[in-house]
């Protein structure tokens, strides 16, 4: 078990407000994004500079490095870690993840990467938390899942790292895990006898969600987020009702057969659930006064949304409104970060080219 050092920061309005949690419903994983800083360095920052100079509402319960875990906020208190812009896209943490979760920050090395020893220490800590609070590993989520912030960045650019981490925690807990990875997500895939139901998560759930959307069973709030929660249950029930089969919200062979039949009748969507084409404007689009607006902006927003970079996920039409405001710029910036482009939130030729490549 990783060495845990209890080293609470002082109660203050910015990093430790002293508010009580409403319960522990999940674990939110983060990374520090401060190359070379140790867990103790982070603890001292949130007990000093962040309060006296930055005056920024930010913190986490635990900071983990290759050596130890610094426990800086009591587990029964709120840490300010995952409520950016009042967002919460994880149903079991709504309406505010800060009040229902414990946060774990992984320190990064000088090269900006998370060391395997740090990941192992984090897994040991999280396994202990899951055991004590009766949490299954599908309650371990990324900051990105909660608010769409690119954190932990290595786990956003490669989502399989979260799956691997969950399996590691399952192993530490002595649980047997079943792989949920499939070799194909096309509409024409054959039934494998897979059963998916509420609480499941991963790439196979995300593939199912994409197929549901393509077949006309919308997921307006969360889209294809890889979590089999109430919205997906209702979409599956709607499919089952339409197909005249047992309505239980559980995806199995009969539901797969029904979905494949409906998908085969769909002529307009492609096999991955996207529109056949996304026209994109030329030129430069950025935030300016007055805001840029019109068809070109809407085309950019629709293309980003097709790749799950929503201007304002959960809002009306997921923020696709034809105005190039801060939220659209943020969606562009997130897209650029994920695909190795200069992350300035400005749409130009490079961003257009990358969008076109991914939407082919």
Swiss-Prot record:
Output the Pfam families linked to this UniProt entry.
Amidase_2 (PF01510), PG_binding_1 (PF01471)
Q: Name one GO biological process term.
A: peptidoglycan turnover
Could you tell me the keywords of this UniProt record?
A: Cell wall biogenesis/degradation, Hydrolase, Repeat, Secreted, Signal
Q: Which reaction does it catalyse?
A: Hydrolyzes the link between N-acetylmuramoyl residues and L-amino acid residues in certain cell-wall glycopeptides
Question: Where does this protein chiefly localize?
Answer: secreted
Which residue ranges traverse the bilayer?
none
- Compartments reported by the entry: Secreted
Q: Can you supply one Gene Ontology CC term for this chain's record?
A: extracellular region
* sequence repeat spans: 166-191, 196-259, 265-289, 291-355
Annotated region (2 X approximate repeats) at: 166-289, 196-355
- Keyword check for Mitochondrion, yes or no: no
Query: What family is reported?
Result: Belongs to the N-acetylmuramoyl-L-alanine amidase 2 family.
Protein name in the entry: N-acetylmuramoyl-L-alanine amidase CwlL
Q: Which species is the source of this protein?
A: Bacillus licheniformis
